[in-house]
Amino acid sequence: TLRRKSLEAQLLTAREYITNICESDVSTVDGVQRNPVWTSLILRSYARNISTLAKKTNILKDVSANADGITAPTLDSYLNALERLFVIEDIDAWCPAIRSATVIRSGKKRGFTDPSIAVAAMGLTPEYLEQDLKTFGFIFECLAIRDLKVYSSALGGKVSYYHDRLDLEADCVLHLSDGRYALIEFKLGSREIEEGAQHLLEIKNLVHQAIENGTTSLREPDLLMVITGGEIAYTRPDGVKIIPIGCLKD
């Protein structure tokens, strides 16, 4: 189909882009000579951990299996170069005073500026992703975050995420420069919408309680939204909006 051909063309472009990054850009960005094979391994490991809170130590362990002699400072140097090239772009944690600071996770969520780079780095195809819905879910999250950043940039939009050690999470918190913010979950399939909506309502309730107790200066979230891979937009009776990813630009 036309859509499949367009996806394959995008992936071909992304693969060529990765070759350029590994063979030249990663060294020319700051004049430090870097190993193309190591760069490729780092990109692949980062892509495998996309949309997760994987620690750098885990990525180093993963890369070390095939890159003998790579150290933590070397990995940092490569990752800094990839950030400067706008290839990888991590997401910071949102740490509001609604739970004890020790309960809220504060590590960075691993991300790419464009999900097609992650797909190409792992050597995956659209057909493979249709079979591996778990990986597709992580890629879908990266795609939705990219779109949210683009469409909210005129409003000073910034994104973070919320995740605590009790496993309550919002995949994305979108903050606008006027103080408004939205709690967002990303769910590929319709069966997961309920779980996503409950997470958002629970976080909203925590914010409400913290306001009542006078322990936060936060306002309540202005929007609760589950972004899906479906085609129908609607508002649930509890106020959570279900929005297909294709409707975001509207």
Across the structure, where does each feature detected by a protein language model lie?
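Hydrophobic/aromatic beta-strand patches that form the interior of the parallel beta-sheet core
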Residues: G111, S160, A182-I184, M225-I227, ...
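Switch/connector loops and helix/strand junctions flanking conserved nucleotide-binding motifs
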Residues: A120, I193-E194, A233-P237
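Residues at the C-termini of beta-strands that transition into short coil/loop
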Residues: D114-S116, H163, K187, T228-G230, ...
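Accessory nucleic acid-recognition modules appended to NTPase machines
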Residues: L2-R180
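Short mixed-charge
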Residues: N205-L223
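Domain-level recognition of nuclease-like catalytic cores that cleave nucleotide substrates
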Residues: D222-D250
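Short, surface-exposed loop/helix-turn segments at secondary-structure junctions
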Residues: Y128-D132, G196-I203
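Active-site ExK catalytic segment of metal-dependent nucleases
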Residues: Y181-E192, H199
